[in-house]
Amino acid sequence: MDLLLGIVQGLTEFLPISSSGHLTLLSHLLKTDLNAYQTAVLHLGTLVSVVLFALDGIRRSLRSWRIILNLIVSTIPAGVFGVLFEKQIDQLFSSPRFLPLFFSATALILMFTRYSSSGEKRMENMSFLDALLVGIAQLFALFPGISRSGITVSSLLFMKYRSEDALQYSFLMSIPVVLGAGILGLGKGNVTILAPIFAFLSGLFALYVLSRSVRSGKIWQFSYYCLFVAILSYLAG
């Protein structure tokens, strides 16, 4: 079970297909009780992999006070909403009822990127308004079925940021969110140390695939898979 959870978490955390949605669906199909706190513990494994992949972005942010301030602004919406509605969000992980809707929404967002070409804006010059908007977009990823990487990268592409900067900023945004969720989840789940290790290894592979798909402008192709999972979750419900 640890192997399965770790691989599913690692692959789906960074591919734009929603890790929380897949874990919720998997929990329902296997008749296991996997709540939001337990998925948060799995995030600790993927956190290490994203830090390794985001080293360039981390170096850039350390040289730019604007990036650091923008990351704080981008983190606030999801952080505040997650604290205020913690119980309600946790309840969404116990039922696949809304998964078809949320997976379909992710598919639609990804499909639109097919018609949005990469721009020239860089994260060093990001406005506070853009930082807030992408932070609000990340807020929706608290719902299982909405992909965090999918909605944040897509939002930045829609705002005409370079594909490389959209990737790096999305990676940087995930670090405080995943770290905070993982710390909250420590000691509250029954996931062993093996699951985060498997999540780390599969997360590295997923990050490589995501990077190639965004840089080649083919992230929209994941929309077909999200539609498939939306149908599957509807049938499973």
Swiss-Prot record:
GO terms for cellular component: plasma membrane. It catalyses: di-trans,octa-cis-undecaprenyl diphosphate + H2O = di-trans,octa-cis-undecaprenyl phosphate + phosphate + H(+). GO terms for molecular function: undecaprenyl-diphosphatase activity. Keywords: Antibiotic resistance, Cell inner membrane, Cell membrane, Cell shape, Cell wall biogenesis/degradation, Hydrolase, Membrane, Peptidoglycan synthesis, Transmembrane, Transmembrane helix. Its EC number is 3.6.1.27. Catalyzes the dephosphorylation of undecaprenyl diphosphate (UPP). Confers resistance to bacitracin. PANTHER family: UNDECAPRENYL-DIPHOSPHATASE. Belongs to the UppP family. This is Undecaprenyl-diphosphatase. It comes from Thermotoga maritima (strain ATCC 43589 / DSM 3109 / JCM 10099 / NBRC 100826 / MSB8). The lineage of its organism: Bacteria, Thermotogati, Thermotogota, Thermotogae, Thermotogales.
